[in-house]
Amino acid sequence: MPIRTFIFDFDGTILDTESQDFVVVDEMWKAHDQVLELTEWRTGLGTTGGFNAYDALEARLGRSIDRAHWKAHNHQRLLEHCSTQPIRPGVHALFDYAIAHGITLTVGSSGNREWVHRWLHEHGIFHLFATIVTSNDVSAVKPSPEIFLTVAANVAAHPADCLVFEDSAHGVTAANRAGMRSVAVPIPSLVDAWMPDSALRLRTLADITPAELVARAAAAPLPSATA
C-alpha cells in the first residue's frame, strides 16, 4: 500500500531540541553539585509525566530549590541553545520528496502548540504542513496513539497509508498502537536505547535516499493497532 502521509514528530526528529534540554538541565544539576545520569533523563522523552528534573533534583538534595528562578533561567537558556540548532539531517530532503510525490506533510508532537509553532516558523517550514497536532489538541500524549490518529483524521488519511518519523520509544509505541508504520531515528543520546519494533531504524534520515526509505518502509509489515 503506498505511503500517502508523512507524520513527523517535532522535538528530536525535525529539530534536536532534546539534546539541548539535557545540556540546560545538566547545568542546573551541576550548579547544585549533583550529577544527572543520561539514562535517567531520557526516560521522559517523547511524553509528559515522565522524568521531572526539578522533582528529581529536590529528592536528591532533600530540600526545595527556587523553582520559579530555575524554570525561568532554564527556559531562556533552552531558547538560546535551540536557536543555534539546524534542522536534522535528511529532513529537508524528505520534505522535498513528499512535495514532489504528492505526499501530505504533517506534524504530530507531544510538545505544546506555542513551542512547536515557534520553531516551525523560525525555520520557515510551518507552511509545509497540512495539519499540526500537539498536546493542546488531545487528551493523551504519546505513547497513546491519539496524536497520530488525530493527525490522520484531520487529513482524511487511513493509518495504513501513514509513515511516522520518530526519535523516541514513546513515539514509536504510539505509532504502533495507531496501526502506522514508523521510522525510528534516535538523537545521539538515544542511539543505544531500546526501541520498539519499527519499519526502519536509522542513525539519521540522510542515511538512505528518500525513495529507498519510503520503499523499504512501505514493504514492512503493518503494526496491529491497539488504540
Language model feature labels by segment:
Residues 82-86, 110, 178-179:
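Short, flexible loop segments at the rims of nucleotide/cofactor-binding pockets, characterized by
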Residues 35, 104, 181:
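Residue-level detector of anion-binding/catalytic polar loops
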Residues 1-4, 96, 112-113, 117-227:
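Asp-based, Mg2+/Mn2+-dependent phosphohydrolase catalytic module
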Residues 87, 108, 140:
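Residue-level marker of regulatory loop/turn positions in helix-turn-helix DNA-binding domains and
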Residues 2-93, 99-101:
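N-terminal helical cap/lid subdomain that shapes the substrate entry/recognition surface
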Residues 13, 109-111:
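Conserved phosphate-coupling serine/threonine residues in phosphotransfer and NTP-handling enzymes
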